[in-house]
UniProtKB/Swiss-Prot annotation:
It is found in: Nucleus. Residues 25-326 form the Protein kinase domain. Its EC number is 2.7.11.22, 2.7.11.23. Its main location: nucleus. InterPro entries: CDK, Kinase-like_dom_sf, Prot_kinase_dom, Protein_kinase_ATP_BS, Ser/Thr_kinase_AS. Serine/threonine-protein kinase involved in transcription regulation. Phosphorylates the UBC2/RAD6 ubiquitin-conjugating enzyme (E2), leading to monoubiquitination of histone H2B and the silencing of telomeric-associated genes. Also required for histone H3 methylation. Necessary for the recovery from pheromone-induced growth arrest in the cell cycle G1 phase. It catalyses: L-seryl-[protein] + ATP = O-phospho-L-seryl-[protein] + ADP + H(+); L-threonyl-[protein] + ATP = O-phospho-L-threonyl-[protein] + ADP + H(+); [DNA-directed RNA polymerase] + ATP = phospho-[DNA-directed RNA polymerase] + ADP + H(+). The active site is at residue 155. This is Serine/threonine-protein kinase bur1.
Amino acid sequence: MAIASLERDDHGNPRFRGCTSIRDFEFLGKLGEGTFGEVYKARSKKDGSIVALKKILMHNEKDGFPITALREIKLLKMLSHRNILQLKEMAVERSKGDGRKKPSMYMVTPYMEHDLSGLLENPAVNFTEPQIKCYMLQLLEGLKYLHGNRILHRDMKAANLLISNNGVLQIADFGLARPYDEPPPEPGKGGGEAKRDYTTLVVTRWYRPPELLLQLRRYTTAIDMWGVGCVFGEMFKGKPILAGSSDLNQTQLIFNLVGTPTEENMPGWSSLPGCEGVKSFGYKPGSLREVFKDQNPMAISLLEELLKLDWRKRINAIDAINHPYFSSPPFPARPGELPSFEDSHEFDRRRFRGQRGAIPPAPAGGSVDQQQTTEIAVFPVLHALAGSLHTGFKTILQSALLKTGMLYHMDLQTRGSRFQASLVQKIAACLLNLLCLLIHHGAWVIQIGRHVREVNAIISEDGPMGNWIHTSRLTVTLVDILEKGKAIVRVPLLIGVIWNSNTLMKGINRVILGTDVLQEREAGVLTFERLEQRIEHCTDDDKLVLVSTDAERLRQMNPVTLLVLNDSKFITHLLLSMTY
């Protein structure tokens, strides 16, 4: 078989179309860093143009190229629009030394002086309404192009909107984007309906629409339009308008702003998997008009259309562009008429924050499958428990936790069957220790929430994954402690583990212990036979959590049931420590 000759660069390395050497660029400084990688400002030695270099982190070299980066590269190479960030080429940094280490890869894009979030945090920047209209029209034109080509962005937020000193806005960060199987939106028809399921583990929490928070799987382009509404409001207020501290709090903030869902304003909401936690909120009419009372009626009208609870009727990009807001005075500025500002990137924002003062914390939820590396942050349990426990129970529990350390909040993505086994054992040990500690000090019913469907959705989107832990998120929190030392402790646990190519680690979505079973236990007449009958009626998504000192009897029961042993010898190592 004949092998085509390869063009070689000045250093004798093979040059491929669309791929160059990192030596062709002069580094000018770092713009930002995070779990996604590192971003640098650089100058091309070939033509003198200023570019941004986004280094792709290879957290486990044996596993190959990160799938989120592959997805982003593939989509950006397909797209071509003034308001979509262009991927100019890929750059390779070959390893030094013996060459056994894999080369580093960089995405090369045009340099944009700002992102919208950075501009809004700059105390020297104040947007005029013509400027807001100009940016909004460009954002909507970019989304119209994406949705018209059946692409969902799935992480619409101010930080992902880049702005040049020429006033041009471009949509960036396509790590969560994916092709969309439904027809493109049509005028007057909102986002339409979806016919297939998608993962709900998308969109940064502060910009996440209510249907995703309620676990709608068949979502549409309307999820991006909700993010546009959040960005629109943010440009008026100068800060995020829905900065929730948790998914539940995020839902509360949304309903406080736009009103409580009903079957009239959000048909079908009460049948969504996540509705149970919000049914007790109580009716609220919404405060959007009051919050934005300083804006003109047309702006409020567009904001209401973008933040509509009913995703089927939420305005699409086509209709938003034609909204009367943009044809009423003051008219939109042209990009070239906008003022220029000092650069506003991640490192610049740190300085701005010192000038402006404290701003809301970074979204704790984030976009789960956007995480590209292991990140472990200490999360003190005692702080999380403050104000949530009955006084007597809190005193006992705090005393015990002070002796054992802290829990961890972890975002992790990794692969490998050996690591899986070790990880599962350590997580199980940590949870058992925690649960047993609680039981030992008064808790008597433990609920563990585990969403298998979301994990399956991630797997199915990218095909068979074999022995991979593709994207996992472990969050341990303690809430809803009841009075008199008898507690229902809810420990939300979301973790996707592919034990092998055929078996997904089973979990628990909700406890099926009814009040009758609780009453039987209270009366002292609850038997193992009664619990066994309950387990027989469980589905894969409804698994019972049992608490008992009789370990052998529990082991004889359903193997997918989580066994929680009330044994003091397990109350030793609450601190979960792992080295990657």
